[in-house]
Amino acid sequence: MDYQTTNSEPFYSAGQKQQHCWEPGEKAEYKRLRAQLGSSWAYYEYEELITCTNRLGYRSTTVVPPTVGDYFIMCGCSNVFGQYLHEWHRASNRVEKATGVPVINLGICGGGANIIAMNMQKLWFSNYPKPRAIIVQWPSIHRMAFPSEDVECRLIHIDIARENSGGVQETHASEYLLRHEGVYENQAHHAFHMVNSLEVPVINFAILSYIAEFYDIPRVRFVSAQDDRARDNLHCGRLMNKQIYKHIMKELNTV
């Protein structure tokens, strides 16, 4: 079998090429939020939001590292992916526009620290050019994602939140791992130190305080405004992505 560790792609597959306007079950939730938040809500007037993923399942126009010129990589969870948000509002798109340097967005919905490290390790063992810098929004510590050869499910997630909402019920993997002290913490630290040892500049940040404290990295805070949330009223919105963009640009000026 042509396992993903040996194939010619620079990154693990996170899904399939697809295009959609709504996440599963989102239409009903949108109607509820519209009624709850009223006409001052940024998404009160419906504006088509198309999410397109490339052949590796990432929401990124640049799929593989360019053979000529610099490029950046931006890793993280659904907040980097830009779930429930128009592409042009994402921090990665803003960085690309401001610098003229392509940004490969490797945001994975439900992704954990381990898959960030695995993707970087896969790239480093390939013949592809390496990035000018890696930008990482470190996700929840108590979460992991593993590449699969199943074409219908390219990533297997171990996440207590998913299990509580009906996922991976047959294993209860997160509950099992949580009973063993340090399992999540050790893998998260290992992933962090591996990525930060690749001899290219790494811009680290977190959105939540406990993650920033765990890794001892900067925290980019939510802006106190309703417009700060995406269409689900949970994920990072337009203003928050501007904050992230400003943090990244400030750090890029020092590397």
Positions of PLM-derived features:
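A structural signal for short, well-ordered beta-strand segments and their strand-loop junctions
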Residues: P102-G107, A133-Q137, P201-I207
